[in-house]
Amino acid sequence: MDRFLVKGAQGGLLRKQEEQEPTGEEPAVLGGDKESTRKRPRREAPGNGGHSAGPSWRHIRAEGLDCSYTVLFGKAEADEIFQELEKEVEYFTGALARVQVFGKWHSVPRKQATYGDAGLTYTFSGLTLSPKPWIPVLERIRDHVSGVTGQTFNFVLINRYKDGCDHIGEHRDDERELAPGSPIASVSFGACRDFVFRHKDSRGKSPSRRVAVVRLPLAHGSLLMMNHPTNTHWYHSLPVRKKVLAPRVNLTFRKILLTKK
């Protein structure tokens, strides 16, 4: 499930690249670029069908990119949930907290954990594993997300960033275990961090074309819905931000297919 880690674990190269914008591209910031982002507060859920009552959504659109953003939890509730996550989530240790790149082992620049329904399996750094059973705080978040979106989720990947030096490199959530066409719900608690989308055709030193980067600051208690076909056309990352000193916990809720035996 974390095949993307291979690209992000080579010394300090990733950090240097993530702190720079590609030459000739102007980043589109949420609410700033009229063509790449559109602020449309609505009382409806993103995805399949509407919801009679719920938060106001900002819809982010670009070529092949379809996302919806809202602040799902007020500060007091978000603070409470964040403290529960800090106490209750059990993160990977040992070999599961490292990744092998070209025969060498590297520490993952963040903490990770997975929880989900019984019977599920997933691929993580070349290993096929089963998630831990749901705990109350995760069920609380999952059920609230489902209530406002109309979507169901059976798995969550949790990433904890101790400060702005922890990061994740450019990747796409395109693992074979994901239900085709299903959205991914990204919920954030703690420090606000920039979330960066880059089109697959505009990556590298010699991109085939120029497509504006889309950057979204993900606030404490926020929800970002990444709808199909976003992960087909766009890579995303959480770049290094050295001025950020506080921790952040991000949960990406997914719908995983049950492996046939």
UniProtKB/Swiss-Prot annotation:
GO biological process: DNA alkylation repair
EC category name: oxidoreductase
A GO cellular component entry from the record: nucleus
Catalytic activity, reaction form: a methylated nucleobase within DNA + 2-oxoglutarate + O2 = a nucleobase within DNA + formaldehyde + succinate + CO2; an N(1)-methyl-2'-deoxyadenosine in double-stranded DNA + 2-oxoglutarate + O2 = a 2'-deoxyadenosine in double-stranded DNA + formaldehyde + succinate + CO2 + H(+); an N(1)-methyl-2'-deoxyadenosine in single-stranded DNA + 2-oxoglutarate + O2 = a 2'-deoxyadenosine in single-stranded DNA + formaldehyde + succinate + CO2 + H(+); an N(3)-methyl-2'-deoxycytidine in double-stranded DNA + 2-oxoglutarate + O2 = a 2'-deoxycytidine in double-stranded DNA + formaldehyde + succinate + CO2 + H(+)
Residues that hold substrate according to the record: 102-104, 122-124, 174
EC number: 1.14.11.33
Gene symbol of the encoding locus: ALKBH2
Effect of residue 101 to G: Loss of activity toward N1-methyladenine adduct in either ssDNA or dsDNA
Span(s) of short sequence motif PCNA-binding: 3-7
PROSITE patterns: FE2OG_OXY
Description of activity control: Activated by ascorbate and magnesium ions.
Record region (Disordered): 1-57
UniProt binding sites for Fe cation: 171, 173, 236
Name the UniProt record assigns to this protein: DNA oxidative demethylase ALKBH2
Family per record: Belongs to the alkB family.
Subcellular location(s) per record: Nucleus; Nucleus, Nucleolus; Nucleus, Nucleoplasm
Taxonomic lineage of the native organism: Eukaryota, Metazoa, Chordata, Craniata, Vertebrata
InterPro entries (alphabetical): AlkB-like, AlkB-like_sf, ALKBH2, Oxoglu/Fe-dep_dioxygenase_dom
Tissue: Detected in colon, small intestine, ovary, testis, prostate, skeletal muscle, heart, liver and urinary bladder.
GO MF annotations in UniProt: broad specificity oxidative DNA demethylase activity; cytosine C-5 DNA demethylase activity; ferrous iron binding; rDNA binding
Domain notes: The PCNA-binding motif (AlkB homolog 2 PCNA-interacting motif, APIM), mediates the colocalization of ALKBH2 with PCNA at the replication foci, coordinating the repair of alkylated DNA damage with DNA replication.
UniProt function note: Dioxygenase that repairs alkylated nucleic acid bases by direct reversal oxidative dealkylation. Can process both double-stranded (ds) and single-stranded (ss) DNA substrates, with a strong preference for dsDNA. Uses molecular oxygen, 2-oxoglutarate and iron as cofactors to oxidize the alkyl groups that are subsequently released as aldehydes, regenerating the undamaged bases. Probes the base pair stability, locates a weakened base pair and flips the damaged base to accommodate the lesion in its active site for efficient catalysis.
Record annotation: effect of changing residue 125 to A: Strong decrease of activity toward N1-methyladenine adduct in ssDNA. Has no effect on lesion repair in dsDNA
Cofactors: Fe(2+)
Transmembrane domains' residue ranges: none
Annotated SUPFAM superfamilies: Clavaminate synthase-like (SSF51197)
Consequence the record notes for mutating residue 9 to V: Found in a patient with endometrial cancer; slightly decreased PCNA-binding
